[in-house]
Structure formats: C-alpha cells, structure tokens
C-alpha cells in the first residue's frame, strides 16, 4: 500500500481481501433505524461494528478512545463539535447542519421503539407528550423537545415521518445490511425480527392526534 503526496492511501486498485482484510459498514444504530445509508454504497461491508450504537454512543466512544485508549487527540475535536448533516440537498452541508434528526431526542425516541421489552408505540408517545411526561419517559431533557417542536403539529409530523420511514424503506436497507456486533438488549438482525409492512397507527393514536390538534 502506497501513501500519496496528498496524505491518502492508494492500494493500486486492489481490494481489501488482497491485504487479508475486509471493509466495514460504518452505519450506527440511529442511521440504520431510519435508513440513512445508500443501497450498495455505505451500507455495504463485511461487518457493522457500530451498528448497535446510537449516535450519542458513537460520540462517547470517540471521546473514550482519545482520553483513555490513545491518551491523545487521535480523533480531531471537529469530529465531536461539527454540526451533523444529512447532506440530502444543497442546503444541508457539513458545518452548516441541516440534519433533520435532533440526536439527543431522536436517539431516545428510536430506542423506545426498539429496545424496551414491550416496545413503545406512537400512541404512547402522543399520550406522554399530551401529559407533559415524554422527556421523563424517554430520558432526555424537556427543553430539547420544546425547542425542536414549538407546537403539537410539528411534533406529530416529525413522529409520523420517522415511524413511517423506520417501517418502510429502512427495513429493506436493514435486511441487506451486514451482520451487526450486538451489545444492547435488542440489536437489528436476529434480535429484532421484522417484516416490511405498511406502518400502522391504532385508533387511540388517531384519537390523541385529533385531540392535540384541536386544542
């Protein structure tokens, strides 16, 4: 393997197997939940080593590597401080942000959908939101929710958007994703059996939604 003058590594057109290795899928659990990966692109790999880590866990792991393992700043500070971006349009760029995910909130929301023994439903999320107890149930700061969603309409739109995405295209991507190193009580794959079906909202959800929007 030869290092170029620009600092990158050139492998002479050889794949990772030429060096007795394989390339990894670097999608984290938050990204896998909503399908933030490209078919036959960054979702490819032999193994997804951080596929069971939520976004905030990835940041914590990076800090741990710098502080405890390497005891120096191997990972640049910008890795932790730069505003994330989905880069889905010209308005969403690294540095300016534009990522529709509010990770301190959405990590906890998605975790409630997946990791609890009795998985939380959208109806329960709406009930807790109407009672003012959502932050307590999810384990996040209440200010994060109120700042991200100024009213019930924006909160509901966000909830439905991610719930639908989680159960449609994201399922197809997870099915084709590589094996995940499992560290939580429920990882995608064998721990979480799923089928690509139409997202479902029960009657209670629609009742609570109408109540919140009409108040």
Please place each PLM-identified region on the residue numbering:
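ATP/NTP-dependent adenylation/nucleotidyl-transfer catalytic domains that generate, transfer
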Residues: 1-215
């Amino acid at each position: 393997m030869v290092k170029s003058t620009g600092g990158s590594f050139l492998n002479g057109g050889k794949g990772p197997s030429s060096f007795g290795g394989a390339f990894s899928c670097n999608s984290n659990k938050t990204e896998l939940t909503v399908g933030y990966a490209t078919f036959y692109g960054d979702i490819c790999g032999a193994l997804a080593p951080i596929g069971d880590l939520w976004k905030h866990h990835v940041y914590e792991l990076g800090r741990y590597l710098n502080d405890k393992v390497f005891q120096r700043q191997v990972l640049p500070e910008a890795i932790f401080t730069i505003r994330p971006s989905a880069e889905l349009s010209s308005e969403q760029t690294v540095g300016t942000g534009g990522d529709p995910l509010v990770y301190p909130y959405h990590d906890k929301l998605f975790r409630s959908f997946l990791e609890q023994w009795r998985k939380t439903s959208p109806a329960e999320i709406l009930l807790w939101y109407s009672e003012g107890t959502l932050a307590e149930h999810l384990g996040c700061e209440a200010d994060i929710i109120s700042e991200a969603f100024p009213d019930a309409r924006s909160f509901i739109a966000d909830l439905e958007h991610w719930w639908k995405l989680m159960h449609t295209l994201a399922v197809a991507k997870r099915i084709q994703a590589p094996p995940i190193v499992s560290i939580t009580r429920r990882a995608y794959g064998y721990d979480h059996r799923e089928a690509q079906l139409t997202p479902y909202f029960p009657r209670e959800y629609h009742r609570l939604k109408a109540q919140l929007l009409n108040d």
